[in-house]
From Swiss-Prot:
Widely expressed with highest levels in testis. Within the testis, highly expressed in germ cells but not expressed in Sertoli cells. Interacts with CASP8, CASP10, KRT8, KRT18, CASP3 and FADD. Homodimerizes and heterodimerizes with DEDD2. The lineage of its organism: Eukaryota, Metazoa, Chordata, Craniata, Vertebrata. Transmembrane segments: none annotated. The gene is Dedd. InterPro entries: DEATH-like_dom_sf, DED_dom, DEDD/DEDD2, TRADD-like_N. GO terms for molecular function: DNA binding. This is Death effector domain-containing protein. It comes from Rattus norvegicus. GO terms for cellular component: cytoplasm; nucleolus. It comes from the Eukaryota. Residues 128-191 are annotated as: Disordered. Gene3D superfamilies: Death Domain, Fas.
Length: 318
Protein backbone atom coordinates (compact mmCIF):
# COMPACT_ATOMS: atom_id res chain seq x y z
CA UNK A 1 0.00 0.00 0.00
CA UNK A 2 2.91 2.32 0.62
CA UNK A 3 3.92 1.98 -3.02
CA UNK A 4 0.42 2.91 -4.15
CA UNK A 5 0.47 6.11 -2.10
CA UNK A 6 3.80 7.23 -3.52
CA UNK A 7 3.74 10.80 -4.72
CA UNK A 8 4.88 11.79 -8.18
CA UNK A 9 7.55 14.08 -6.71
CA UNK A 10 9.23 11.24 -4.80
CA UNK A 11 12.21 9.45 -6.31
CA UNK A 12 11.88 5.78 -7.13
CA UNK A 13 14.71 3.59 -5.73
CA UNK A 14 16.05 2.54 -9.13
CA UNK A 15 16.06 6.12 -10.41
CA UNK A 16 19.01 7.20 -8.27
CA UNK A 17 21.31 4.99 -10.33
CA UNK A 18 19.78 5.75 -13.74
CA UNK A 19 19.95 9.52 -13.21
CA UNK A 20 23.71 9.32 -13.61
CA UNK A 21 23.29 7.92 -17.14
CA UNK A 22 20.73 10.52 -18.30
CA UNK A 23 17.84 8.06 -18.21
CA UNK A 24 14.46 7.90 -16.58
CA UNK A 25 13.37 4.84 -14.67
CA UNK A 26 10.34 2.93 -15.92
CA UNK A 27 8.26 4.13 -12.97
CA UNK A 28 9.29 7.74 -13.52
CA UNK A 29 8.12 7.41 -17.12
CA UNK A 30 4.82 6.07 -15.75
CA UNK A 31 4.57 9.18 -13.55
CA UNK A 32 5.14 11.52 -16.50
CA UNK A 33 2.71 9.81 -18.89
CA UNK A 34 0.15 9.02 -16.21
CA UNK A 35 -0.22 12.61 -15.03
CA UNK A 36 -1.27 13.63 -18.57
CA UNK A 37 -3.96 10.95 -18.86
CA UNK A 38 -7.43 12.22 -17.99
CA UNK A 39 -10.01 10.28 -15.98
CA UNK A 40 -11.90 9.66 -19.22
CA UNK A 41 -8.77 8.17 -20.80
CA UNK A 42 -8.27 5.88 -17.81
CA UNK A 43 -11.89 4.69 -17.97
CA UNK A 44 -11.56 3.85 -21.67
CA UNK A 45 -8.29 1.98 -21.08
CA UNK A 46 -9.76 0.04 -18.17
CA UNK A 47 -12.76 -0.84 -20.34
CA UNK A 48 -10.48 -2.29 -23.03
CA UNK A 49 -8.65 -4.45 -20.45
CA UNK A 50 -11.69 -5.56 -18.47
CA UNK A 51 -10.94 -9.23 -19.24
CA UNK A 52 -7.21 -9.00 -18.49
CA UNK A 53 -7.13 -7.04 -15.22
CA UNK A 54 -9.06 -8.68 -12.39
CA UNK A 55 -11.59 -6.87 -10.21
CA UNK A 56 -9.19 -6.37 -7.29
CA UNK A 57 -6.47 -4.93 -9.54
CA UNK A 58 -8.97 -2.74 -11.36
CA UNK A 59 -10.27 -1.38 -8.07
CA UNK A 60 -6.80 -0.03 -7.27
CA UNK A 61 -6.65 2.05 -10.48
CA UNK A 62 -7.31 5.69 -9.63
CA UNK A 63 -5.29 7.48 -12.32
CA UNK A 64 -3.11 6.91 -15.35
CA UNK A 65 -0.04 5.98 -13.34
CA UNK A 66 -1.95 3.24 -11.50
CA UNK A 67 -3.11 1.82 -14.83
CA UNK A 68 0.45 1.69 -16.19
CA UNK A 69 1.66 0.02 -13.01
CA UNK A 70 -1.11 -2.55 -13.42
CA UNK A 71 0.11 -3.23 -16.96
CA UNK A 72 3.60 -3.81 -15.59
CA UNK A 73 2.32 -6.26 -12.98
CA UNK A 74 0.47 -8.13 -15.73
CA UNK A 75 3.70 -8.43 -17.75
CA UNK A 76 2.45 -6.15 -20.53
CA UNK A 77 5.23 -3.55 -20.19
CA UNK A 78 8.85 -3.45 -19.05
CA UNK A 79 12.05 -1.47 -19.67
CA UNK A 80 12.54 -3.08 -23.10
CA UNK A 81 8.95 -3.23 -24.36
CA UNK A 82 6.66 -0.18 -24.66
CA UNK A 83 4.69 -1.56 -27.60
CA UNK A 84 1.50 -2.08 -25.60
CA UNK A 85 1.62 1.43 -24.11
CA UNK A 86 2.26 3.08 -27.49
CA UNK A 87 -0.57 1.13 -29.11
CA UNK A 88 -3.01 2.07 -26.36
CA UNK A 89 -2.14 5.76 -26.65
CA UNK A 90 -2.78 5.61 -30.39
CA UNK A 91 -6.14 3.92 -29.85
CA UNK A 92 -7.38 6.65 -27.52
CA UNK A 93 -5.86 9.23 -29.92
CA UNK A 94 -3.40 10.63 -27.37
CA UNK A 95 -0.65 11.08 -29.95
CA UNK A 96 0.67 14.04 -27.97
CA UNK A 97 1.95 11.63 -25.29
CA UNK A 98 3.91 9.36 -27.65
CA UNK A 99 7.19 11.36 -27.32
CA UNK A 100 7.07 10.86 -23.53
CA UNK A 101 7.06 7.04 -23.76
CA UNK A 102 10.83 6.76 -23.51
CA UNK A 103 13.46 6.30 -20.84
CA UNK A 104 15.69 8.99 -22.36
CA UNK A 105 15.70 12.03 -20.12
CA UNK A 106 14.58 15.28 -21.71
CA UNK A 107 17.05 18.15 -21.79
CA UNK A 108 16.84 20.73 -19.04
CA UNK A 109 15.51 24.18 -19.82
CA UNK A 110 18.28 26.68 -20.56
CA UNK A 111 18.11 30.49 -20.70
CA UNK A 112 16.69 31.95 -23.89
CA UNK A 113 19.72 33.00 -25.94
CA UNK A 114 17.58 35.08 -28.29
CA UNK A 115 16.14 37.21 -25.49
CA UNK A 116 19.58 37.61 -23.99
CA UNK A 117 21.08 38.70 -27.31
CA UNK A 118 18.26 41.14 -28.10
CA UNK A 119 18.51 42.64 -24.63
CA UNK A 120 22.27 43.13 -24.93
CA UNK A 121 22.17 44.62 -28.43
CA UNK A 122 19.08 46.80 -28.02
CA UNK A 123 21.17 49.48 -26.26
CA UNK A 124 22.89 50.23 -29.59
CA UNK A 125 19.67 51.56 -31.09
CA UNK A 126 18.79 53.88 -28.19
CA UNK A 127 20.30 57.37 -28.67
CA UNK A 128 19.59 59.80 -25.81
CA UNK A 129 18.69 63.40 -26.71
CA UNK A 130 21.47 65.95 -26.34
CA UNK A 131 21.22 68.19 -23.26
CA UNK A 132 21.99 71.33 -25.29
CA UNK A 133 18.89 70.93 -27.44
CA UNK A 134 16.01 72.50 -25.45
CA UNK A 135 13.35 72.18 -28.15
CA UNK A 136 12.23 68.84 -29.47
CA UNK A 137 12.95 68.22 -33.10
CA UNK A 138 10.20 67.18 -35.47
CA UNK A 139 10.19 63.46 -36.08
CA UNK A 140 11.96 62.38 -39.23
CA UNK A 141 9.88 60.31 -41.63
CA UNK A 142 11.08 56.77 -41.38
CA UNK A 143 11.46 54.56 -44.38
CA UNK A 144 8.91 51.80 -44.20
CA UNK A 145 10.21 48.36 -44.98
CA UNK A 146 7.73 45.57 -45.63
CA UNK A 147 8.06 42.86 -42.99
CA UNK A 148 9.21 39.39 -43.93
CA UNK A 149 6.09 37.41 -43.16
CA UNK A 150 6.49 33.68 -42.80
CA UNK A 151 5.60 31.52 -45.78
CA UNK A 152 3.31 28.56 -45.11
CA UNK A 153 3.68 25.46 -47.26
CA UNK A 154 1.04 22.76 -46.78
CA UNK A 155 0.92 19.29 -48.36
CA UNK A 156 -1.71 18.68 -50.99
CA UNK A 157 -2.09 14.94 -50.47
CA UNK A 158 -0.88 12.65 -47.73
CA UNK A 159 2.55 13.32 -46.33
CA UNK A 160 3.83 14.85 -49.58
CA UNK A 161 5.29 18.27 -48.86
CA UNK A 162 5.41 21.22 -51.24
CA UNK A 163 8.43 20.31 -53.32
CA UNK A 164 9.05 20.90 -56.99
CA UNK A 165 9.47 17.85 -59.17
CA UNK A 166 12.83 17.92 -60.97
CA UNK A 167 12.65 18.29 -64.72
CA UNK A 168 13.36 15.21 -66.80
CA UNK A 169 16.17 15.02 -69.26
CA UNK A 170 19.93 15.25 -69.21
CA UNK A 171 21.42 17.82 -66.88
CA UNK A 172 23.83 20.28 -68.44
CA UNK A 173 27.22 21.23 -67.11
CA UNK A 174 26.00 24.70 -66.15
CA UNK A 175 23.19 23.29 -64.03
CA UNK A 176 25.62 20.96 -62.27
CA UNK A 177 27.85 23.91 -61.39
CA UNK A 178 24.88 25.85 -60.06
CA UNK A 179 23.88 22.85 -57.98
CA UNK A 180 27.35 22.57 -56.51
CA UNK A 181 27.29 26.23 -55.57
CA UNK A 182 23.90 25.85 -53.91
CA UNK A 183 25.14 22.99 -51.75
CA UNK A 184 27.65 25.24 -49.98
CA UNK A 185 25.73 28.35 -48.84
CA UNK A 186 27.41 31.71 -48.68
CA UNK A 187 28.31 32.51 -45.05
CA UNK A 188 27.01 36.07 -45.58
CA UNK A 189 23.74 34.89 -47.11
CA UNK A 190 20.62 35.33 -45.00
CA UNK A 191 19.45 32.04 -43.50
CA UNK A 192 15.84 30.83 -43.23
CA UNK A 193 14.29 28.03 -41.20
CA UNK A 194 11.31 25.72 -41.58
CA UNK A 195 9.01 24.96 -38.65
CA UNK A 196 6.63 22.01 -38.99
CA UNK A 197 3.12 22.58 -37.64
CA UNK A 198 0.79 19.63 -37.07
CA UNK A 199 -2.93 20.26 -36.57
CA UNK A 200 -5.40 17.50 -35.75
CA UNK A 201 -9.12 17.54 -34.98
CA UNK A 202 -10.67 14.75 -32.92
CA UNK A 203 -13.65 13.88 -30.77
CA UNK A 204 -13.52 14.85 -27.11
CA UNK A 205 -14.73 11.44 -25.94
CA UNK A 206 -15.29 7.99 -27.44
CA UNK A 207 -17.13 6.18 -24.66
CA UNK A 208 -20.57 6.47 -26.26
CA UNK A 209 -19.25 5.01 -29.51
CA UNK A 210 -17.49 2.11 -27.77
CA UNK A 211 -20.21 1.11 -25.33
CA UNK A 212 -22.56 -1.41 -26.88
CA UNK A 213 -20.46 -1.81 -30.03
CA UNK A 214 -17.55 -3.78 -28.55
CA UNK A 215 -18.54 -7.37 -27.77
CA UNK A 216 -16.98 -10.82 -27.95
CA UNK A 217 -18.42 -14.25 -27.10
CA UNK A 218 -15.19 -16.21 -27.45
CA UNK A 219 -14.38 -18.60 -24.62
CA UNK A 220 -10.65 -18.03 -24.43
CA UNK A 221 -9.90 -14.82 -22.45
CA UNK A 222 -6.96 -13.89 -24.68
CA UNK A 223 -8.94 -14.34 -27.90
CA UNK A 224 -11.83 -12.41 -26.38
CA UNK A 225 -9.52 -9.55 -25.48
CA UNK A 226 -7.99 -9.42 -28.98
CA UNK A 227 -11.41 -9.40 -30.60
CA UNK A 228 -12.60 -6.57 -28.38
CA UNK A 229 -9.34 -4.77 -29.00
CA UNK A 230 -9.70 -5.03 -32.80
CA UNK A 231 -13.32 -3.91 -32.67
CA UNK A 232 -12.43 -0.85 -30.59
CA UNK A 233 -9.51 -0.08 -32.89
CA UNK A 234 -11.77 -0.22 -35.97
CA UNK A 235 -14.34 2.06 -34.36
CA UNK A 236 -11.75 4.63 -33.33
CA UNK A 237 -10.14 4.62 -36.78
CA UNK A 238 -13.53 5.27 -38.37
CA UNK A 239 -13.92 8.31 -36.12
CA UNK A 240 -10.67 9.87 -37.31
CA UNK A 241 -11.38 13.47 -38.34
CA UNK A 242 -8.07 13.87 -40.15
CA UNK A 243 -5.02 16.05 -39.70
CA UNK A 244 -2.84 18.47 -41.65
CA UNK A 245 0.90 19.15 -41.67
CA UNK A 246 2.32 22.53 -42.67
CA UNK A 247 5.87 23.78 -43.09
CA UNK A 248 6.21 27.44 -42.10
CA UNK A 249 9.27 29.30 -43.35
CA UNK A 250 10.71 32.09 -41.18
CA UNK A 251 13.38 34.61 -42.10
CA UNK A 252 13.12 36.94 -39.09
CA UNK A 253 13.93 35.95 -35.53
CA UNK A 254 11.26 38.17 -34.00
CA UNK A 255 8.49 36.44 -35.96
CA UNK A 256 9.80 33.00 -35.01
CA UNK A 257 10.02 33.95 -31.35
CA UNK A 258 6.50 35.42 -31.38
CA UNK A 259 5.16 32.31 -33.12
CA UNK A 260 6.69 30.03 -30.46
CA UNK A 261 5.33 32.13 -27.60
CA UNK A 262 1.85 32.04 -29.15
CA UNK A 263 2.15 28.26 -29.35
CA UNK A 264 3.23 27.94 -25.72
CA UNK A 265 0.55 30.22 -24.24
CA UNK A 266 -2.28 28.77 -26.36
CA UNK A 267 -2.94 31.81 -28.56
CA UNK A 268 -2.03 29.85 -31.69
CA UNK A 269 -4.51 27.12 -30.77
CA UNK A 270 -7.33 29.61 -30.27
CA UNK A 271 -6.55 31.28 -33.59
CA UNK A 272 -6.53 27.98 -35.49
CA UNK A 273 -9.86 26.86 -34.05
CA UNK A 274 -11.72 29.32 -36.23
CA UNK A 275 -9.85 28.05 -39.29
CA UNK A 276 -10.13 24.28 -38.87
CA UNK A 277 -13.31 23.78 -36.80
CA UNK A 278 -15.69 25.02 -39.48
CA UNK A 279 -19.47 24.87 -39.68
CA UNK A 280 -19.30 21.99 -42.14
CA UNK A 281 -17.16 19.97 -39.72
CA UNK A 282 -19.55 20.69 -36.86
CA UNK A 283 -22.45 19.60 -39.03
CA UNK A 284 -20.65 16.36 -39.94
CA UNK A 285 -19.95 15.34 -36.33
CA UNK A 286 -23.43 16.25 -35.10
CA UNK A 287 -23.90 16.95 -31.40
CA UNK A 288 -20.58 15.41 -30.32
CA UNK A 289 -17.92 17.74 -28.97
CA UNK A 290 -14.65 18.03 -30.88
CA UNK A 291 -11.29 19.52 -30.01
CA UNK A 292 -8.21 20.70 -31.87
CA UNK A 293 -4.67 19.48 -31.17
CA UNK A 294 -1.71 21.59 -32.29
CA UNK A 295 1.90 20.43 -32.17
CA UNK A 296 5.18 22.18 -33.04
CA UNK A 297 8.48 20.32 -32.83
CA UNK A 298 10.72 21.91 -30.22
CA UNK A 299 13.86 20.73 -31.99
CA UNK A 300 12.80 22.51 -35.19
CA UNK A 301 12.32 25.70 -33.19
CA UNK A 302 15.72 25.46 -31.51
CA UNK A 303 17.56 24.75 -34.77
CA UNK A 304 15.70 27.53 -36.54
CA UNK A 305 16.46 29.94 -33.75
CA UNK A 306 20.16 29.23 -34.06
CA UNK A 307 20.06 29.93 -37.81
CA UNK A 308 18.19 33.21 -37.43
CA UNK A 309 20.38 34.24 -34.50
CA UNK A 310 23.33 33.90 -36.86
CA UNK A 311 21.64 36.46 -39.15
CA UNK A 312 21.52 38.96 -36.29
CA UNK A 313 25.16 38.38 -35.46
CA UNK A 314 26.16 38.98 -39.09
CA UNK A 315 24.15 42.22 -39.14
CA UNK A 316 25.91 43.42 -36.00
CA UNK A 317 29.34 42.98 -37.59
CA UNK A 318 30.92 46.18 -39.00
Amino acid sequence: MAGLKRRASQVWPEERVEQEHGLYSLHRMFDIVGTHLTHRDVRVLSFLFVDVIDDHERGLIRNGRDFLLALERQGRCDESNFRQVLQLLRIITRHDLLPYVTLKKRRAVCPDLVDKYLEETSIRYVTPRALSDPEPRPPQPSKTVPPHYPVVCCPTSGSQMCSKRPARGRTTLGSQRKRRKSVTPDPKEKQTCDIRLRVRAEYCQHETALQGNVFSNKQDPLERQFERFNQANTILKSRDLGSIICDIKFSELTYLDAFWRDYINGSLLEALKGVFITDSLKQAVGHEAIKLLVNVDEEDYELGRQKLLRNLMLQALP
